[in-house]
């Protein structure tokens, strides 16, 4: 594995170029939610990468020395079967997916345990009120259930938080981080709000 990682370093030196440590790709623009300010809502279910295209991207990336792949969306988890298939085909890679978490269930947890190279980063906007306010009623409780499932199986996962003028105080508080740790999260991504997409507000 160390030798594989060195491929990218050697290429950087030889060709005077930068090889990415990770490659981001959108498997689909489809999503089961309709969150405020999400660009994907503009595209609906129109944009999809085929399983073979995703597989080809990973195969090409490995030749460069890239072994980390990050799924964004849309909601990548609407492609659960394909996600697991890619994990099976590339056991030497690690796959992280940003997800709203509502499609994580017991069956998928068992698949994660089996393939061992998939990690979700679940979207959370802070409190139940701010999360449901942006993502829809009941989403916060579904996220909590997904985290409980993952934690109960000892599966690693993280959180993805978009900070806005409405939630910045809450998501930067010690209480929020304590809550994430208590839920079992291993890491957190923070993104600033961009007023694009569905009913986006500039303030």
Give the label of every model feature segment:
Residues 1-8, 12:
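Single conserved hydrophobic/aromatic residue that forms the stacking wall/gate
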Residues 5, 15-19, 63, 89:
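Short, flexible hinge/linker loops that cap or flank conserved catalytic cores
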Residues 11, 31, 35-38, 122, ...:
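Hydrophobic packing within well-folded, soluble alpha/beta domains
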Residues 17, 22-52:
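Canonical Radical SAM [4Fe-4S] cluster-binding loop centered on the CxxxCxxC motif
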Residues 48-51, 137-140, 203:
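Short, conserved loop/turn and helix-capping segments at secondary-structure boundaries
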Residues 54-71, 79-192:
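Radical SAM/AdoMet-radical enzyme domain recognition
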Residues 193-203:
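A C-terminal junction/extension of Radical SAM enzymes
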